[in-house]
Amino acid sequence: MTNSNLRTENHFDYVKITLASPERVMSWGQRTLPNGQVVGEVTKPETINYRTLKPEMDGLFCEKIFGPSKDWECHCGKYKRVRHRGIVCERCGVEVTESRVRRHRMGFINLAAPVSHVWYLKGIPSYVAILLDMPLRDVEQIVYFNCYVVLDEGDHKDLKYKQLLTEDEWLEVEDEIYAEDSTIENEPVVGIGAEALKQLLEDLDLQEVAEQLREEITGSKGQKRAKLIKRLRVIDNFIATNARPEWMVLNAIPVIPPDLRPMVQLDGGRFATSDLNDLYRRVINRNNRLARLQEILAPEIIVRNEKRMLQEAVDALVDNGRRGRTVVGANNRALKSLSDIIEGKQGRFRQNLLGKRVDYSGRSVIVVGPKLKMHQCGLPKEMAIELFQPFVIHRLIRQNIVNNIKAAKKLIQRADDEVMQVLQEVIEGHPILLNRAPTLHRLGIQAFEPKLVAGRAIQLHPLVCPAFNADFDGDQMAVHVPLAIEAQTEARMLMLASNNILSPATGEPIVTPSQDMVLGSYYLTALQPDAVKPDFGDQSKTFAGLEDVIHAFEDKRINLHDWVWVRFNGEVEDDDELTSPLDTQILEDGTQIQQWTYRRDRLDEEGALISRFLLTTVGRVVMNNTIIDAVASG
């Protein structure tokens, strides 16, 4: 077995994101080749040679740093084939290995001057400003070379530690120091740029500052107390993670692997490249120029300007547009920085890591399924056959309908009646999970019993919509099939929609009728003002039972809001009913008929009920009958 085929399993307890020390950044990119040569530093802004189309050495796609661009082949072509594995070419210095190492091998750029990390400087809140207990504006003035900061006041009585000085003010101080009659022996020290910021952060003794803050907090209140607590919290986090504040200033920046920022040739011979390559190129160009200026001892003002430009180039690489002008490419389009790749809905985390496509899942538009029970959902046949395909194939073979998987797949493609019958058997008692993004609480994923339906839309019971915050204006939902018996049991016992009536947040019912259901119920039971109430005994409007009324309505012999007399021997409650009947009539056989506003009762001699007819509307009969059926079946 080759090394590439060996699968080493790493078991992680957790993933932690912390500040990286300069040594760690270097260790990511720096490697010692088998011949003892140390590689990793990217020093040239070039990407590929325009004639040979091969990566330039020490450039952004360098094969010596990142690995060969072709499997088992060095840059110059001296070594080819897998038999030379692990050899470093003595001519070009490229290690003979697989090209896929270019997906994970990193490089680094050694900066000629330190630069501040824009996330910690310009983030909200600004951690640099909080740690130094300085206004963000002052910190920015230092970093971007607008003001000097006093690092050591020396013997000068008018200067204070961390005081800001403009160019003119510092010149005046210098004149005082170097005047002939000056008594200052211990000269003050000032700094500017990220170097000065780094010095300030290095001077912080976190343990000592934390102790002072705790003492101050006990004796303060209001806004001052809140500010102190905020600073203490940041310092405590630095101490807990063993991170140093000066690590927020970078001496070297990592270069991500070249296959993660590719350069591809288009049909016309032109190249399309990742924006990161342009941003890295700007950093390398400015870094090399700064190193050259320092080498030739250029005037301070020129060096300082170059340092500021390097700072801005690194800012654009890390988070383009966070500060200053946004760097744009062709067509005035803003270049996509590292932050843009990571953050947002289309970013690496939400799109690729959290939003991965998984097997045994699908998604479709939801439509209302009014005939479904609450724990059921309508699953399109086309979707069900795909999701449950392995189960269907297994059952087809077990029932000797087909002999092998290939034959089973052909049968499934034809959508044979036997397949549909087997599919029906498979999904019987196999719950599925429905999820609607965004899943903001646990009821965003619930289990349902699938029912096969025609069409391509998932049918959903309207009562479960509030839990999903779903409506039927084009919303989509994802379907997942729990495979393991444990997962199916959990779905059935805990996640079934009919088991999630109450909101876990408030304890109040989350299954509440709304919109169409409320309007429909109102329309069904509403009274029509101009409807005529029939006399008792009217053959077309008097019925022997609730079912007869519904049959007459279905046959269109009566309308939904017509008044009817219907026989009903159950209990009746009416808040508007009078305390005594409107009229009582005693018949020859001793029975009596009581006439109320909305009912007519016939009682025997002892006052026991013989029969009862109610005056009601067809819609109310339908509503009542539906409730009785639901309670009886439940």
Swiss-Prot record:
One of its GO terms (biological process) is DNA-templated transcription. Zn(2+) binds at residues 74, 76, 89, 92. Binds 1 Mg(2+) ion per subunit. Mg(2+) binds at residues 471, 473, 475. It is an enzyme of class 2 (transferase). Transmembrane segments: none annotated. One of its GO terms (molecular function) is magnesium ion binding. Its EC number is 2.7.7.6. Keywords: DNA-directed RNA polymerase, Magnesium, Metal-binding, Nucleotidyltransferase, Transcription, Transferase, Zinc. Belongs to the RNA polymerase beta' chain family. RpoC1 subfamily. In cyanobacteria the RNAP catalytic core is composed of 2 alpha, 1 beta, 1 beta', 1 gamma and 1 omega subunit. When a sigma factor is associated with the core the holoenzyme is formed, which can initiate transcription. This is DNA-directed RNA polymerase subunit gamma. It comes from Prochlorococcus marinus (strain SARG / CCMP1375 / SS120). The lineage of its organism: Bacteria, Bacillati, Cyanobacteriota, Cyanophyceae, Synechococcales.
